[in-house]
Regions:
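Polar, enzyme-active/binding microenvironments
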Residues: 1-169
Length: 169
């Protein structure tokens, strides 16, 4: 019987009208984060199934995937923002919710100031020096919202209603 924990390696791109099959990712994972553009993107972290967390990073150049340097902490449900030369990964689960934040300079990951609240499977958008992280599903729904200025996280006005679930831009 098929492995219910098997992860797909398929990759597709969208041109504004239709989807096209692209070269496969190197390692199939789920619950990872991603950031970048259609021709320069990165996926980091995630799980290969059966509770196995990874710290892999894979970079897309518009044609193919290459293995990048690993995150400092294996995690799933982390949030990301930025570009392949100025990326940000924060929060996630390993296995409990994390405060950890890391930045990427195109070559390596560096630990930076922690989040004020642990966020797993939250929403995140922006760039490495100006990002917003909000909500969470772990532990429970949260209304917390934080902004990142390239140095530290600051709690800002909370959502009126606690939220959970992922969103990336």
């Amino acid at each position: 019987s098929p492995d219910s924990n098997a992860k797909t390696v398929n990759c597709e791109s969208y041109d504004g009208t239709s989807w096209s099959e692209e070269n496969n990712v190197i390692t199939g994972v789920s619950w990872m984060t991603g950031f970048g553009t259609q021709t320069a993107a990165m996926i980091v972290g995630g799980t290969t199934g059966s509770g196995v967390l990874v710290n892999n990073s894979q970079t897309w150049n518009g044609t193919s995937w290459t293995e990048g340097n690993n995150l400092l902490v294996a995690t799933e449900g982390n949030q990301g923002a930025g570009t392949v030369t100025a990326g940000l990964s924060g929060g996630g689960l390993a296995p409990s919710a994390l405060l950890t934040s890391q930045t990427y300079d195109g070559t390596s990951w560096t630990e930076v100031n922690d989040l004020n609240s642990a966020h797993g499977y939250a929403g995140c958008f922006g760039i490495q020096t100006s990002a917003v992280m909000c909500g969470s599903s772990t532990p429970g729904r949260q209304s917390t919202t934080e902004t990142y200025d390239g140095t530290s996280w600051t709690e800002t006005t909370n959502f009126a209603t606690a939220r959970y679930g992922r969103s990336e831009s």
